[in-house]
């Protein structure tokens, strides 16, 4: 009885089992039974299936291996593609730079862009930036949803700009294959960036998906065990009293976190892309404004010969390289009675050549006034290449090239035979001299109004044009127009046409002209119209105009200077009149000397008139009237001005 009682004693039985277990440890199970056990088994709850875990882990590892293998292939291939695109971009940038600004090599391939400006160069450069960023930031840890959105937006904006360009006939006919392809290529660069972002998102989700599924399964098992543990603990507490619970195992969530370096890289990339977005927003507004202005001025063109005025575009050669915008008033096609000695003899056609920073819209108003007063019968204006509505010329350009282009456009294409009285204002005086010299057979007389001297085409002309000071040094000024030797360097009296900017400054302005913010303020703040932006005061902010000024500046002291000097002898028998500004002559003795030299280019100089007012004589009432009288005397029609 006693033995049986001892055998049935739970405490003794536990002690004996403990002794046996300590003597034979290999008999112990690998994991003791515990309600928190996640291993081999638990007497108090369900156990995790080890076979399932091993199979699941193997599947995950195999999936991740395949995904990462595909990712490495994707990175390798994308680097090759992007490097090739950047190489093509760089070659294209250099080619465009040379072709648009120094020598037209596109003509070798039969391509032309009659709407060339700084836009193409800017778009190609942005394309290089986009492809470079695609290459540098094409990593799994650098994916950003914002970058994807920016790439898509920039791609659409670029295509929208191209659509605006193709919206109207004028720009659609002139942009050409090269200009169109530039827009498409830039859009393609942003499209590539969006595709790469999409692939990064795909691989990011593919890598995280199996881990996320495993996490969900582990979380479900953990939740089940936790619920079972809570019920067991509650039962233990009720049986053995309160105790401290053991922390439950939790699987860590697979999160898409970035390191500090990655955040800096993402922030830098997105900042640059955001700046590009701002640029494209301004670029789009500029394109929209230019499209509206151009449409307003060209949608009714050409105006046919049946109208009182004639306005059309004419090619400059048989190859149809580009077109000049020509406007005429009066019957310029009537060739009858040109040799008649009667009173009904037709006057010569006044052919006006505008200045360096204007068109006939501004500087020919004094001739327009004579026409409306019926003092002259007919006159023609044209915009030089890159000015107003005339096409952008191929590089290089010189005065003689423009003169030859004008002759073909007038005589061959427009069938305006002349004869002409050529009138040149400011820089246009040099173009008038060369055109007259090359066409003495169709030119009756020539008039130069505040004309440039050929010496102004040379690079160091400003130092010689400035009034002399008390010193002979030229060490730079102090910002107030004086240098250390007392020499006056105040250039404020110089007209903007004469104070020519150097090539770098023209280049810099041209690059920023793509934004068009000065053109935007012209209508937002100054309330200027379309003609002012295309022909008038705001034309100097147009990218096509700045490109033409750059081309003129590059060749001025080489080709253009030689054109003027080589054709000087042909002018000796041309009837000529000279008009000079009194203010300009008084401010610079050298300017007066140069004007005097102009009176000697012909043996048949009729008069040299110094009129009241400044360089822009058409703005001064008395000076304008005096200039009109000189023109009428030159063509033998002065009596009409004094008639009641």
Swiss-Prot record:
Residues 1-90, 144-147, 196-271 are cytoplasmic. It is found in: Vacuole membrane. Residues 348-619 form the AB hydrolase-1 domain. It comes from the Eukaryota. Residues 14-26 have a biased composition (Basic and acidic residues). It holds the Pfam family Abhydrolase_1. The modification Phosphoserine is found at residues 22, 56, 63, 244. It is a multi-pass membrane protein. Residues 112-122, 169-174, 293-644 are vacuolar. Residues 239-251 have a biased composition (Polar residues). The chain crosses the membrane at residues 91-111, 123-143, 148-168, 175-195, 272-292. Its main location: membrane. Keywords: Membrane, Phosphoprotein, Transmembrane, Transmembrane helix, Vacuole. Residues 1-35, 225-251, 469-492 are annotated as: Disordered. InterPro entries: AB_hydrolase_1, AB_hydrolase_fold, DUF2417, Meta-cleavage_hydrolase. GO terms for molecular function: catalytic activity. GO terms for cellular component: fungal-type vacuole; fungal-type vacuole membrane. This is Uncharacterized vacuolar membrane protein YNL115C. It comes from Saccharomyces cerevisiae (strain ATCC 204508 / S288c) (Baker's yeast).
